[in-house]
Amino acid sequence: MDVLSAAIAVMRTGQPYSNRLQLGEQWCYRFDRYDGIGFHVLLSGTAWLIPEQGPSIRLDAGDVLLMPHGSPHHLSDSPQVMAAVPVEDATAGDGPADFLCGKYRLDRSRVHPLLAGLPDVIHLSGGVGAHPELDAAITLLAAEVDATRQGQSAALTALVDVLLVYLVRAWLDENPITGWPKAIHDP
């Protein structure tokens, strides 16, 4: 088994979760610290990621975020935090921002050094055209989240796992590699 596969297999506990968030004109949602990994894919519109530490990041359609350490953050229609609502209380809107989100719980007592070495926020900007497999996984996951069918839970679990692998691969392909991430490229 390769290093990335082992890192994910050893840590995951529980059932992955994924959903769509279509948001109205003015909104700001708070994502509290989570004991796992979370992701956001902006399918359409524009938005802002406001991390707990660091500058706000503008998001455009096709941008993908990975929060490898479950760091608290906000998603908003503006670069400043307004009166934030917990994401659990989010209500659907008819605005242009449409997110595909997901998360799964990790056993932090068994953190693999590869995942521990990732930054708090991974932002793949400008679409993901350079990574067609990531595009395909996003398309499949979005279709599965939108439908209610037999086997949906099993499909969502598998697709969230695949999406995580492709997100980490894409980041490793685009960034200088040091430490444990570098080790996976060393035969």
What is the predicted role of each segment?
Residues M1-V64, S71-A92:
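Generic protein-terminus/edge-of-domain signal
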Residues G38-V41, E133-A137, L159:
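Amphipathic, well-ordered alpha-helical segments in soluble domains
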Residues L43, I138-D146:
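Regular secondary-structure segments
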Residues F99-L100, Y104, V111-T139:
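Aromatic/histidine-rich interaction motifs
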